[in-house]
Structure formats: C-alpha cells, structure tokens
Amino acid sequence: MKKRSHWLAAGALLLGMNVAQADDSNTLYFYNWTEYVPPGLLEQFTKETGIKVIYSTYESNESMYAKLKTWKDGAYDLVVPSTYFVAKMRNEGMLQKIDKSQLSNFSNLDPDLLNKPFDPNNDYSIPYIWGATAIGVNTDEIDASKVTRWADLWKPEYKQSLLLTDDAREVFQMALRKLGYSGNTRDPAQIKAAYLELKKLMPNVLAFNSDNPGNPYMEGEVNLGMLWNGSAYVARQAGTPLAVVWPEEGGIFWMDNLAIPANAKNRAGALKLINFLLRPDVAARVAETIGYPTPNLAAKALLPPTVANDPSLYPPADVIKKGEWQDDVGEASVQYETLFQQLKAGR
C-alpha cells in the first residue's frame, strides 16, 4: 500500500521492547502498515491463542525493507509487503516459504487474486488487502463521461488542476500504459519515453500526494487526477461526489500481503495469525475498517451489499483483466526514481 494519514489502534501497540525480552513461542512481532488493523483485533487474537502481539507500523515499503535489512536477528515474525516488494524480498532471500497446509482458511481467498506474477503459487505471500489506482473525478465539477483514458489527463483544458500520486512506479506506469508499454518494463528506452511523456503532462499537474490523496478532493483543491479506489470510497462516505474511472489503457493494481521473514523466530505463531486474519469475520472487519477491498470471498459475502457490490471497490473481471499488477523491476527501479525526482524538480 501507500503512505496514509495517521491513527493508531489504542491498546494494540507495545513499543520499545527488546526482542529478547519475551518467550518467542508466546510472543509475535507484527510489522504492518499504519491503519491496517482494527482496534481490538489483536487483543482478540491474544485472547483466543494466548500469543501476545508486539505491534509496530511503517508508512512505506522502503522503510519496512530497510528495517528488515538492518535487523539480522529475527526482529519480526510477520510483515505486510506490497506487490513488487514481495518479489524483491523473495528474490533476495528475505522471506521464507509459507506452509499453506497450516492455513485452514486459505480456501476463503478469491482464486482470481492468487498466483500473481510477483509470487507464483503464493509460496511466500498471502493476500491481505488489495486495491487499484485509477482516475478520480469530482462529478460536480467535471463530466466523468469525458474522462475515459489516462491520455485524457494530458488535455490542455486541465492545466494546473491534476493530482498525481507521489509514487514513481505508479506515475510512470500511467505514462507507460498510455504509450502501450508494460508498467513493469525494465527497458531503459521505454522508461525514458515515459519520462518525456510525463514532462508534457507537468503543466497540468497541481500537486503530488501520497499521504492521503483523497483529502485534496474532499477539500475542493482538485477535481481530477490519479486516485486509489479505497481513498475514493472513503471520500464518498464523507459526502464528496467522487467517481472512479477505470482507464481504457488499464488500471494499476496492487496487493498488500502477509509474509514471514526468513529469520522470523515465531513461525508457528505467524501462521496462526495469518489463519486468524483469513477468517471471514475477521477479514470483513478489516475491510470495513480501512475501506479497501478484501481478497477474501467469504469475508466479502459478510459485507453490506452497498460495499460488496460497489464496482469502484470491487471492479468487474474485465477491468481487472485489462489492468496490470505491479511487479519488481530490479535495478531499473533506480532509473524510475531518478527520473521521477527530475520530473518533480522541473528538469
């Protein structure tokens, strides 16, 4: 997932403890995104299993990755990397294989959301929450029928009005799809072509925002741009007339996944927590709290029909098929990030 606004579940955090202070079998160190666990949920897990959860949070895949690289002695037992970071960490030997025979609730997951390129057969990751980046349109100000493609954002009529996410891979993926390329390309020439295309877009860009991209729409600062579908849902719940348009070139799909670090000390406990989080009642509670789609079909069946049948949250199969899941691009990530910083600096 991306950066988010901040709230912490009261009572769920036990910070500042030395890893060696607790019995490994009765203590689980869970490192997760901010806003990703409903209040009281981990206490419920502890009550049911006797396993105490030491919970801490991060705001980017990069900070989670750096922490795991720094701590070599098994500081965490369960983490939640996004799509292409699963592939990166798997390829670097940072994750261990997951024994799915210990996950009785694995069958609740949507088969269409399994076996993605970033982790074939889900050997190293289990879907937790998923989402997509598409086009957000304030329908009180802009006719959504006139915005059907990523390419429409380049129209001169939208000068100094667009919001883009502050995410190199997403912004470049938009341009790459516009040009007919894969958003996961490692080809330097294609990445450079996307950069040149984005330079043409910059006169239309008002702001980059990945802290909470729904807020500028809610506050009336922008009416058009890139937007995560979960952020759009939250904004609509607050009364903002915000539509999600699935671009004809394809949306950008991502997934946040439960994974066990290679040096985790409490593998058995991690498997128990994963299985707990895959329970229909638990997964439904998570989805309702954070406002993003659940990959759990049994949980989706428990959601209010207005949520479960919302095509902006749960896009039709043809929309998903047309879109593209983010994957690791290896060393090409340096070129993406370098050019993205140049783009924002006006160079």
Tell what function each PLM region has.
Residues 22-88:
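Early extracytoplasmic/lumenal segment of secretory-pathway proteins
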Residues 75-76, 80-86, 90-221:
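Extracytoplasmic ligand-binding site segments that recognize negatively charged/polar headgroups
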